[in-house]
Every structure is written in C-alpha cells, then in structure tokens.
A protein has these predicted regions:
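Serine-esterase "nucleophile elbow" of acetyl-processing enzymes
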Residues: 19-68, 84-96
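Short, solvent-exposed loop/turn elements at domain surfaces
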Residues: 36-41, 74-76, 274-276
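Acidic Gly/Asp/Thr-rich repetitive segments characteristic of extracellular carbohydrate-active
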Residues: 265-296, 302
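Beta-solenoid repeat scaffold
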Residues: 288-296, 303-322
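Alpha-helical cap/lid subdomain in secreted, periplasmic
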Residues: 23, 82-235, 239, 243-257
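Active-site-proximal beta-strand/loop segments in catalytic clefts of secreted hydrolases
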Residues: 31-34, 66-72, 98-103, 140-144, ...
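Bacterial N-terminal signal peptides
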Residues: 7-16
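Bacterial N-terminal signal peptides that target proteins for export
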Residues: 1-7
Length: 322
C-alpha cells in the first residue's frame, strides 16, 4: 500500500508538470494587510492570511501572487512603493484583489486615511491603474474582528476577561468605502466582513476562537508565552475564510469559476494547506468519518512513505494539477 500510493503521487506529479507548461496562467495579485498576507513558517508558526491559503482552491491555470503585508494601509502600501511593484507586473487578463481598512483606521499619519475621502481615493487609484494595464480589480472590505465585548462595554479592546454574547463591529465606515467605490466604478465587490461576521456569529463565542490566534502558553515554539489575538487567522481559519472568498468569487467574478477546485484537505510545503505531509492528511481523512476523501498534494518534495489502513478511503493522492 505504501509503495502504490507513492508511485501514484510521483506519476501524477510528472504528468502535471507536463500539463502546466502548455498554458500561460492567469495571475491573481493580492494587495492588503496582515489578514490577507503570507506568514512566516518559522518555529511552527500557525498564523495564516486568507490570501496565503487561496492557491489550494484554484487549478494550476491560476497563480496567486500575494503582496499583502502586515501593518499596511492603502496609504502606506502606496507610499512604500509596494503598489508600483505590483503594477509593473500586471498583464492583460490578470486580477488584483484589494483589501484594506484594518490599518487605514489607525491614527498614525503614515497609515491613516478617511472613509469617504482619502481611503476612497486610494481605492479608486488601485482600480484605475489596474484597468489601465488590462487587469481586473476586485474590491473586498475587511474581515471581521472577533470582538465579543461584555454587556455594557463600549470600549473596543483586543480581548476581554469575560466575553459577551454579541459580535460587535469595529470597522465602521471603513467597511463602506470599498462597497461605495465598487458601485461607483462597476467593480466586483465581495462583502468579506459580512461573510466572516456571519461565520463567527454562527460558530458562537467559544467555537469561533478556533479560527483565530488563540494560543495556550507552552504549546508552540514560535509563541511559547501564548496569546489571544482576535484579528489574525490560524491555519484552520485561513482555509475557511479563503473558502468563503472562493464561494463569493463564483458569483461575483464568474470568469474565475472554471478554475476553482475543492478538496477536503490540502498538503503543501509552502504553508498554503492544512498539512505539510501527506501522512498527516491521510491520518485526518481516516479519522474524519467520510468514506470518500479528496486530498490535494501541491508541488514540493515529499520524502515520506504513506501508510493507511486497507479500504479506509476510496480515493487519495490528487496532485496540484490532477
């Protein structure tokens, strides 16, 4: 069984490499803040931006080039020259996913913009300059902060000693600027705040912690002291939110729908999947209770033998282009 699985994976990887050379891919450029950005994998870091997890939802005809960066607003992204770098790379038919707001609301002069004026102006610039290069802009508003204040508390904090039952918005008018500019300029808009608000509310106060960086002390090398972070997503949260984005894209940007793929688990050495090894995915699949499980193995070197109980699964071992 071990040998058969390994040979199947190797054969599919070789076939997929041949197929990938035959067609120029579409690129999705991503610009935004830490909730979208790629994260370091050092010391077992489990934080992920939703953009980091997006490649596992597309065929190899789509390349995700994530330029989102921690701590950036629409203003600082422009002033640091990051937008110029992205703009120079856009070709006709590419996409630019734009999500700012978390840091635009901060008071620091190098970050702050105003909804209805400077924030909207920066979004318009991204749209106009993307279109001038033949690209397709898509606007998003910010993902929700997991903010459950105790009853009667109006001050927004990073965390509370005791949480209340109602999820309360923290972004205000910064959520409306992308919607407004999208309507004004006929740009696809994804209300990612509503999607994530509904997700967190539906999961409830305690279960929704599983999406975010709630880390017990002593569990991970990258954060031995532990942390409570209601803004940033973990591996599970990043995958779930990326899935919500893909669902919305199929309606708002139907041209991308034919490139969408869905698997129960994704294995990826670059951190864009649920697991780093095939064996971890197989173990999760065997214990998951489903008879048919699909596993995507993204490109990388997997020097491992894969073992699984006979007849436990009907299907495993899809490659990145299979």
């Amino acid at each position: 069984m071990k040998l058969k699985v390994l040979l199947a994976l190797c054969a599919l990887l070789l076939l997929s490499a041949f197929i990938a050379e035959r067609k120029e891919p579409i690129t999705i450029f991503m610009i935004g803040d830490s909730t979208m950005a790629n994260k370091s994998l050092k010391n077992g870091n489990i934080e992920r931006g939703w953009g980091q997890m997006l490649p596992g939802y597309f065929t190899e005809e789509v390349v995700v080039d994530n330029h989102a960066m921690n701590g950036r607003s629409s203003l600082s992204f422009i002033n640091e020259g990051r937008w110029d770098v992205v703009l120079s790379k856009i070709h006709k038919g590419d996409y630019v996913f734009i999500q700012f707001g978390h840091n635009d609301e901060k008071p620091r002069a190098t970050l702050h913009t105003e909804p209805g004026s400077t924030f909207d102006d920066n979004l318009r610039r991204f749209v106009n300059e993307t279109r001038a290069k033949g690209g397709n802009p898509v606007l998003f508003n910010s993902i929700v902060r997991r903010n459950f204040p105790p009853k009667g508390v109006t001050e927004i904090k990073g965390s509370y000693e005791k949480e209340g039952p109602v999820l309360v918005d923290t972004h205000g008018e910064y959520l409306e600027s992308p919607r407004r500019v999208a309507g004004e300029m006929n740009v696809p808009f994804i209300d990612l705040n509503k999607l994530t608000h509904d997700l967190v509310t539906g999961m409830g106060v305690e279960n929704s912690r599983k999406l975010f960086m709630w880390i017990p002390a002593g569990q991970y090398e990258f954060c031995p002291e532990g942390k409570i972070d209601n803004t940033h997503l973990n591996i599970y949260g990043g995958r779930i939110v990326a899935g919500l984005v893909v669902d919305a894209l199929m309606e708002e940007v139907p041209a991308l729908a034919k490139y969408v793929r869905r698997y129960d688990y994704v294995v990826a050495k670059d951190g864009s999947g649920d697991f780093f090894t095939v064996q971890e995915a197989v173990n999760a699949a065997v214990g998951g209770g489903k008879k048919t499980i699909s596993i995507l193995v993204r490109p990388g070197v997997y020097e491992e033998y894969v073992s699984m109980p006979e007849s436990s699964l009907d299907r495993i071992g899809e490659t990145d282009r299979g």
